[in-house]
């Protein structure tokens, strides 16, 4: 939706009085004041005066806000007891939905909500502003408002020595934050909400009382305005100000369906899929376009184990002629490494996978000591310093990304996510989608707050908010839906670092205690020896000694903090919420957080994203396939968990049930739980809109006795069928970064075999997907 909406109002809030407030002081009554915060109208927290020594304070103060009624305007009112010695004590906190107000005046009484009988009385007055219209762009969940840009040029006047004094320029609520400069030098710009009552504040850092305040609404648009500063003494500099309208077009796509590029890809891919299905299923006739099912591969995480297994399974699908039947491949954590490697070749699925598999073997079996060689560490440092210079936030995940690249490759790869578009240009390969989880850096676990973020060669975005950007712009700075600073696209290794930073926790601690590579790997191994099963690790990790190891010291100036999560510029920053966002079906399908009813605390209010490996919540890459607009019929679930063949799939099913997302119930029998088979089909005839799931857990069943489907093992071949997948000393534990040649060969053969040995079930499931499409076609109205 994009329109001029004449629903701007003036909200006057009169804080009247409070009564019966409890005393927070030992001897006297409280000294109370009230704060008001309305982020959709102002970046400031406003405050009443303090009324001393009273349980029944009277303020009778007015505050004014310019609001738009199409937004979700939630005001936070807080009462505090002022204290000269300690932190001010909170007395009352309340959230008030301004959208419940009608035009006119209304009084509200907010109780303490405890056994106390005290309350806060506030009067709200809402008036329509008929001469003020604002253009809003919305998808029904988030809203982009009008943007203004202020250009500031500082020019020196007078004595050059005096111009060495430092000044600070601030536009509260602007994207850029405070800007520091020497008096009379520098050029700056500020992006800020056009509808707010903003001002430019200039002050001397050694004399904060010497200020210049310029109300920005009074500045004429696109005209140069000259001022001098300071005004109370001989001027140090001249300011040249120019206010302009910000970009009208958004760089963030607000929409809940596939982007035009994905739709164009699917149109091409359908032809490949239709031909492959006709051949694989031996159909007599060509499939009509509305009979072609959407079939997807969903791969979980699991480090080197997941990467290796996915190679084996894709080779199996290719051998059966079924790989061209796939429209999407989704990956998480370790399986993203396989996809990132394969998609460097635009024709990978049309070629024999033996070549890429040999490269994989070389990397998986090589020594990893070189990843922390002095020359490598210096290279990491140089690249991190260059990224910081360009404007990328620094965090430990960036260092992990470079180390991980060295573990998986012999030299740096210049490949970027957007480069993978070439592999989709003719629909010749499935569309890859990589998954991550967005969380909060402080105070909340991923179970309290976790949002699915998807990465494709076309876009990166949040289905929950219907907000997406072109993949080459990920990492650049955005504000209110507009691109304000474009940074060079990161190499894909930095994205792999995000998608797989589950492994960075142990690596991070090992790094901080180690002085040389051998100590690092010894500590890494020691940390893993205590794990008897794979568990979801906690984000909080122990702090190192004051004197960190020499390896860590090389990066202390770049990584002053140790956040595990990847900090990157938030492309949803500055977007506001539509008044009915919570009822939107696309938002409600993914709301799973205690914060989802609190728009002032959701992701668009944060300057940075906090992106994590999905393994911190559920080890799955399925959510992108559950978007109703993708309309997936069949999911081939490739699960690489060593403990619990159905555990992660059951967690996903439970999540979908709670969210009302169509998905079959995952209820394996006790026998299946005890002895999982190579392949399990889950479907729900009562939910025709739910995809069928053909689940391939990582198990060693008939492979023990057969070297190939229908070919029994000889006594000499029995050892080749022994694959350790269950015990705590499995060579395939997710923390293992090096495999023996024998172990990697066994895992590749096992996963390839499990696909090929179930070719009949695969073909039958695909046949049912075709039938499902045909049934829907019959019942579709003309």
Swiss-Prot record:
This is Cytosolic phospholipase A2 beta. Its cofactor is Ca(2+). The active site is at residues 333, 613. It is a peripheral membrane protein. It catalyses: a 1,2-diacyl-sn-glycero-3-phosphocholine + H2O = a 1-acyl-sn-glycero-3-phosphocholine + a fatty acid + H(+); a 1-acyl-sn-glycero-3-phosphocholine + H2O = sn-glycerol 3-phosphocholine + a fatty acid + H(+); 1-hexadecanoyl-2-(5Z,8Z,11Z,14Z-eicosatetraenoyl)-sn-glycero-3-phosphocholine + H2O = 1-hexadecanoyl-sn-glycero-3-phosphocholine + (5Z,8Z,11Z,14Z)-eicosatetraenoate + H(+); 1-hexadecanoyl-sn-glycero-3-phosphocholine + H2O = sn-glycerol 3-phosphocholine + hexadecanoate + H(+). One of its GO terms (biological process) is phospholipid catabolic process. It is an enzyme of class 3 (hydrolase). Ca(2+) 1 binds at residues 25, 31, 81, 83. One of its GO terms (cellular component) is early endosome membrane.
